[in-house]
Amino acid sequence: MSTVVVDAVEHVVRGIVDNPDDVRVDLVISRRGRTVEVHVHPDDLGKVIGRGGRTATALRKLVAGIGGRGIRVDVVDTDQ
């Protein structure tokens, strides 16, 4: 199930950004649970988050629909 979630998020994010080759989606399993980390080119960060966080919220709803509750989605700021 987890690879389906990662593949779906990667497919959607690659369709949104201007630099699809710089997209990387990882599944991190820790004590806090499962987290899907989305890494994009710094110029595309705003597109993935969206106005008022709408795109990021839609990604979270997509993940909840595919993988069930308990999987977090984090858009990682690669500038830091």
From Swiss-Prot:
GO terms for cellular component: cytoplasm. It is found in: Cytoplasm. PROSITE patterns: KH_TYPE_1. It holds the Pfam family KH_KhpA-B. It comes from the Bacteria. One of its GO terms (molecular function) is RNA binding. Residues 33-80 form the KH domain. InterPro entries: KH_dom-like_a/b (IPR015946), KH_sf_prok-type (IPR009019), KhpA (IPR020627). Keywords: Cytoplasm, RNA-binding. Gene3D superfamilies: 3.30.300.20. Belongs to the KhpA RNA-binding protein family. A probable RNA-binding protein. This is RNA-binding protein KhpA. It comes from Mycobacterium leprae (strain TN).
